[in-house]
Amino acid sequence: MASWPPLQLQSSNQSQLFPQNATACDNAPEAWDLLHRVLPTFIISICSFGLLGNLFVLLVFLLPRRRLNVAEIYLANLAASDLVFVLGLPFWAENIWNQFNWPFGALLCRVINGIIKANLFISIFLVVAISQDRYCVLVHPMASRRRQRRRQARVTCVLIWVVGGLLSIPTFLLRSIQAVPDLNITACILLLPHEAWHFARIVELNILAFLLPLAAIIFFNYHILASLRGREEVSRTRCGGSKDSKTTALILTLVVAFLVCWAPYHFFAFLEFLFQVQAVRGCFWEDFIDLGLQLANFLAFTNSSLNPVIYVFAGRLFRTKVWELYKQCTPKSLAPISSSHRKEIFQLFWRN
């Protein structure tokens, strides 16, 4: 069966969904065959690591019987969002393995893609909120009160989940399954009702979900870095640096990883829009955009499994929390004993 690139599985009306010359640009059959065979395995691996990693992060944050600080509230919500997201990846992997033949019905077609779309918004809005909180702590420390920030963080997270869900409604409503008799498949497609929806979609996807948040992230983190440079001399006098500096270093790493993982997706999504409105044409652009979108999707998926790794390797305070949780959950009989206590036990054992 010939490959059917995703660009041709998305259109503004039924007559344009499967053009007669659709196979004229099938210039990369080997690349598509390799993608169908290899990419699902990588996606399942991401799902496994993301599921275990984000569950672990949530357990570390939520099991101890104490209130979360502001940064932990945001990071726990980010882990929860990633966890919900990776649960939908096996369906995506099976879809690619079947060469875009969707076997799960219309409801799951809408639900899975709606979850993916909601995660896109929730994740980047949480990154903005985290950056804004660090900005307030480091740049305007006198204006931020801990109790007020904690309450604000909870409200902000609830609003982000609600807004992310609302922004995913168009995807939920416009996704549908469509039979393709020529290829003997049933595809899960985004069926746009009018040409104007292409513009609305790119405004939502590239501007609302990336460029505007990116501008806010750059603004906040530029001032954060400037503030950290100003405190460099003070930090050198402290052993290991301040707690705020450690938390900020972790968050900056998360921000950079998020942008690296998601920027290619938005780049190819914009190229897809240009192709849809025929600003760019030709078989080269079609194959380049189709294959690029699949690889960019994969790179974006990795962000959900990469965050727990960043917590472990870049988050010194997170590692401390893991150790505290381990000591809390380990029975006292299994806890490590001091050398002096061990010596006393040894002497008592051999004493007659």
From Swiss-Prot:
UniProt keyword annotation of Membrane present: yes
Keywords assigned by UniProt, alphabetized: Cell membrane, Disulfide bond, G-protein coupled receptor, Glycoprotein, Lipoprotein, Membrane, Palmitate, Receptor, Transducer, Transmembrane, Transmembrane helix
Covalent S-S links between cysteines: C109-C188
UniProt keyword annotation of Ribonucleoprotein present: no
GO terms of biological process kind: calcium-mediated signaling; cell chemotaxis; immune response; inflammatory response; positive regulation of cytosolic calcium ion concentration; response to mechanical stimulus
Record's signal peptide: none
Main location: membrane
Residues modified by glycosylation: N13, N21, N184
Gene Ontology molecular-function annotations: bradykinin receptor activity; C-C chemokine binding; C-C chemokine receptor activity
Residues spanning the membrane: 42-62, 73-93, 111-131, 154-174, 207-227, 251-271, 295-315
Side of membrane Cytoplasmic, spans: 63-72, 132-153, 228-250, 316-352
Lipidated positions per record (S-palmitoyl cysteine): C329
Compartments it resides in: Cell membrane
Sequence ranges on the Extracellular membrane side: 1-41, 94-110, 175-206, 272-294
Topology of the protein relative to the lipid bilayer: Multi-pass membrane protein
GO CC terms, sorted: external side of plasma membrane
UniProt-listed PANTHER family: B2 BRADYKININ RECEPTOR, CELL ADHESION MOLECULE
Protein function: This is a receptor for bradykinin. Could be a factor in chronic pain and inflammation.
Stated family: Belongs to the G-protein coupled receptor 1 family. Bradykinin receptor subfamily. BDKRB1 sub-subfamily.
Entry protein name: B1 bradykinin receptor
Organism in which the protein naturally occurs: Macaca fascicularis
Gene that this sequence comes from: BDKRB1
